UniProtKB/Swiss-Prot annotation:
Biological function: The physiological role of BioH is to remove the methyl group introduced by BioC when the pimeloyl moiety is complete. It allows to synthesize pimeloyl-ACP via the fatty acid synthetic pathway through the hydrolysis of the ester bonds of pimeloyl-ACP esters.
InterPro entries documented for this protein: AB_hydrolase_1, AB_hydrolase_fold, BioH, Carboxylesterase_BioH
Taxonomic source organism: Pectobacterium atrosepticum (strain SCRI 1043 / ATCC BAA-672) (Erwinia carotovora subsp. atroseptica)
SUPFAM superfamilies: alpha/beta-Hydrolases
Name under which the protein is recorded: Pimeloyl-[acyl-carrier protein] methyl ester esterase
GO molecular function: pimelyl-[acyl-carrier protein] methyl ester esterase activity
Residues of the AB hydrolase-1 domain: 16-242
GO BP terms in the entry: biotin biosynthetic process
Cystine crosslinks: none
Active site: S82, D207, H235
Residues at which substrate binds: W22, S82, L83, F143, L144, A145, L146, Q147, H235
Location(s) in or outside the cell: Cytoplasm
Amino acid sequence: MAALYWQTEGAGNTDLVLLHGWGLNAQVWQSMVVRLAPHFRLHLVDLPGYGRSQGFGPMPLNDMANIVLTQAPERAVWLGWSLGGLVASQIALSAPLRVEKLITVASSPCFSAQDDWPGIKPDVLQGFQQQLSEDFQRTVERFLALQTLGTENARQDARLLKGVVLEQPMPSVDVLNGGLEILREADLRQPLADLTVPLLRLYGALDGLVPRKVAGRLDDEWPNSTSVVMPKAAHAPFISHPDAFTEQVIAFAQA
């Protein structure tokens, strides 16, 4: 029987749901829990098919968002990292009344590079899909290493991410491929342009997966949202710069 892993902790009055990225699970937020728990009621979720949320197969973005929403508090601040940012954004589009505020971290409404849009080359994502079936473990490790590349403690941060993956049940190759498919195909640029939910977009200046140019483009296209680019961070700013990250989240969520 498929069941979503959902853990709640914290002393605050505001509900804050944290959604992790591709290949990982809610353990990735451990350094954030101690910092955020005094201020929020935290909801730590393993996305369907990831970590402790076993029994789910690959699914489209909309289905993933709906499954997560069924267990969510009536109204919350939603924070999504990378793939989790797409899921949180889809939830804000599907059920705006249930989203008090939205925070996306190192995420993009369209991860794939298009003619005039900065992103990951589609053949790179296809390459990862191909390699997954050949060498599952190594491909996940390579993807994790990419996320911390260029930061001061890149190796240490990559080890931490790898530990998070190994600590919980691994997603199946099918689920991982499904996640890459979402990253390759999703394009929420147009729908999110009309979003009325307050939106904060956090980026790392050194991010090799979501180019910092995305921040500037969306500043122009989504003038109602706010962006912050963290100068020495890459794709996992909450791991490389936990205190600065926490400050941004608290300031925005409690404003």
